Amino acid sequence: MTNAVQTHMPAARAKPKKAIQGEKLRGYDKVARIPIKIIPTVEAKKKPDWIRVKLSSPAEVARIKSTLREQKLYTVCEEAACPNLPQCFADGTATFMIMGDICTRRCPFCDVGHGRPNELDKDEPRHTAETIQGLGLKYAVITSVDRDDLKDGGAAHFVEVLNESRALSPNCLIEILVPDFRGRMDIALDLLTETAPDVFNHNIETVPRLYKAFRPGSDYQHSLDLLKIYKERRPDIATKCGFMVGLGETEEEIYKLLDDLKAHNVDMITVGQYLQPSKDHAPVDRYVHPDEFQRYMDYGKKIGFFNIWAGPMVRSSYFADRQYYGEDCPAPIRSKKALAAEGKLGC
């Protein structure tokens, strides 16, 4: 007698919605048209014990959100569903996302909405500056959606935000996390060389072999060149780059990626675990053990990065001020039971 194997074909889905100006496409509607199709996840991998965040103050989280809504501002913390949001907001920090909340790219790892963005908000630079001042920030991170619809990719808007913020908070350090400005690199670098941040950050996201699947519309070498050329123009400004693990890369590919970043004049590195925002996004290939993250940090220090933070919950702007000042990466939060099972619990 043989056992019948029952297979279930995915139910037919409606055609994905078309992009309409000002409307965000998320989940299936966002990723349905990328070159390498995403098969919806039926059962997600169980998260290990080291995927944890600290409990936070609900009152402080509510205060930050209220301030942001009053100023009509967005944060990548909220739009990208960052798991560290409660901890960072409770600590009085947030990463401002300028140029709206609609991205012109369709990266299947990211939860930021895709579509046809609205025109830039001319008041956003002032509102951002007022919020930085109102929160009393000493270190601010400003990022953006990709704006392939703009001739300069939004670089001039970054400059306006920098100028307005420094006028109101001259002692606040500002890190900008920029898109790749593909097709617009020269004009963008001209603008951001003249009006420079304290840290120039651009995320390369993954290893080159996985670019077609996870970064459609982007180019690995272009991102490396962006970082290198900026550092050549402004050697006095710290450069920074982040990427994810758990997408299907190998450990050897990560070491090669770190070598590439070092060869392209990057000073600081962040490495974090990819977490799937929804069943329609790219699935998690594996959960990387904290010991592997430690090997990446050890290697990064060996080849000469000023600082490298690598850990399950590390994100590009995670305690960015601490990394800038040279502090070591916080250890992941783990249960005593799990540590004991691995023989790592002291007497």
From Swiss-Prot:
PROSITE patterns given for it?
RADICAL_SAM (PS51918)
Q: One GO cellular component from the entry?
A: cytoplasm
Q: Which cofactor does it need?
A: [4Fe-4S] cluster
Q: Which domain of life is it from?
A: Bacteria
Q: Which InterPro entries match?
A: Aldolase_TIM, Elp3/MiaA/NifB-like_rSAM, LIAS_N, Lipoyl_synth, rSAM
Q: What is this protein called?
A: Lipoyl synthase
Name the Gene3D superfamilies on file. Answer: Aldolase class I (3.20.20.70)
Domain (Radical SAM core) ranges: 89-306
Where does this polypeptide localize? Cytoplasm
* Primary subcellular site in the record, as a coarse category: cytoplasm
Task: Please write the reaction equations for the catalytic activity of this protein.
Answer: [[Fe-S] cluster scaffold protein carrying a second [4Fe-4S](2+) cluster] + N(6)-octanoyl-L-lysyl-[protein] + 2 oxidized [2Fe-2S]-[ferredoxin] + 2 S-adenosyl-L-methionine + 4 H(+) = [[Fe-S] cluster scaffold protein] + N(6)-[(R)-dihydrolipoyl]-L-lysyl-[protein] + 4 Fe(3+) + 2 hydrogen sulfide + 2 5'-deoxyadenosine + 2 L-methionine + 2 reduced [2Fe-2S]-[ferredoxin]
Family per record: Belongs to the radical SAM superfamily. Lipoyl synthase family.
- What keyword terms does UniProt attach to this protein? 4Fe-4S, Cytoplasm, Iron, Iron-sulfur, Metal-binding, S-adenosyl-L-methionine, Transferase
Q: How is the cofactor bound?
A: Binds 2 [4Fe-4S] clusters per subunit. One cluster is coordinated with 3 cysteines and an exchangeable S-adenosyl-L-methionine.
Protein's pathway: Protein modification; protein lipoylation via endogenous pathway; protein N(6)-(lipoyl)lysine from octanoyl-[acyl-carrier-protein]: step 2/2
